Every structure is written in C-alpha cells, then in structure tokens.
Amino acid sequence: MTSLTDGLLRFSIHYWPMLNEKQFCDRAMRELREIGKQVLSLATDRDLYQKLEADVIQSNPNLSSSGSAYLSMLRGAYTDATTMRLRRLFAPDAALSLRRLLTQVSEYPALLHDKLTVKELSADLAELDRLSLYLKQQVEPHFSNHERTPAALSTTNRELDKAINLLIDSIKRYYWIVSDSYIDLDVSYGEDPLAVFRFPWIEAK
C-alpha cells in the first residue's frame, strides 16, 4: 500500500515517444502518487468544510439562523478555491494530467486485461471531460452574499463533490491497474480538527 503522507517524491517527468510497459507503469505510479497528494488535500478540505457546516454551524442556532457576512465569505471562499484547484487538476495540458495518463493507458492493452474494459475506460474519460467542461464553462466566482448561501452554492458544491469523488476513484483504480497495489486516499487527522472551535475566540472584556 502506498501512503501519500510519506516524504515528498523528487523526480522529473519526461514523456518519451513510447515506453515499454514497465517504464510506463513506473512513470504512471509516480504521477498518480503526485496527483493523489493534490486530490487528498482537496478531499481533506472538503471534509473539514462539511464538518464545519454539520457539527459547528448547524448544531448552533446562533450560527445557523444568522446571515453572518463572515460565514458567507467562508462558504464562497471554499467553493471558489475548490473550483480553481479542480480546474487545474482537470486541465489536459497540465504538467500532471490524469486525463492524459488515462488516454495513454489505452496504448498498453495488456494492462487492462481482466481489470478494465475499453468501454469502462472510455466512460471514465467521458466523465472527466464532462466535469472539466462544467468547471470551465459553468462555474463563476461568487461575490455577493445572496450568491454565497448554502442553497445558492448547493448545485455547484454537488458538482465539485462529483469531481473530487471521480478523481479519487480514478486514481485508486488506475494505480491498481499499473501497480497491482493500493493507494491510500482516505482523509485522516492527527488530532481533532474541530478543537479550534471548542474555546472562545474572543475573550470577554
């Protein structure tokens, strides 16, 4: 099993005209680990945001019923930042591109034997393209408070969740295909992530 909390990998990525299967698998594993680190960061931020909404804001009537400008800023910042990070991950011309890597997998049909059909690979590529197009064309920055309410952001956040889940599933699947091993993309914490909310932020004067 590969853990993404290990030390940073240091390597240069070179794209040769055609690698043999072992060379391709070695390069693909390195790239998937690096992409996985970025996706795990996104998944962790999503988990923190969802914990904040469910365990802090919704459980406190003083927060859930307020139209706090601070909470509006926080919600809008999460959605907009996540959108921009996903756009970079979905960009086909990025230095690390999952979409490009999946396309190259099709050049090594022996890798897919008993693990994935060509139809399933095509479906994965189509879904990557669909979400990439959505992120590029449909999602705009959220500026005003009425654009930053949970209801206003719900459609965008659902698509962002789909994009993150697709990246996680794809990285796990194709890492298994090229390495015959498992990559850990589970969110975990060394301490209570909500501990910062368990004491007053502003002392009474």
Protein language model features and the residues they cover:
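Amphipathic alpha-helical interface segments
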Residues: 2-131, 157-205
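Histidine-centered, metal-coordinating catalytic motifs and their short helical/loop contexts
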Residues: 125-153
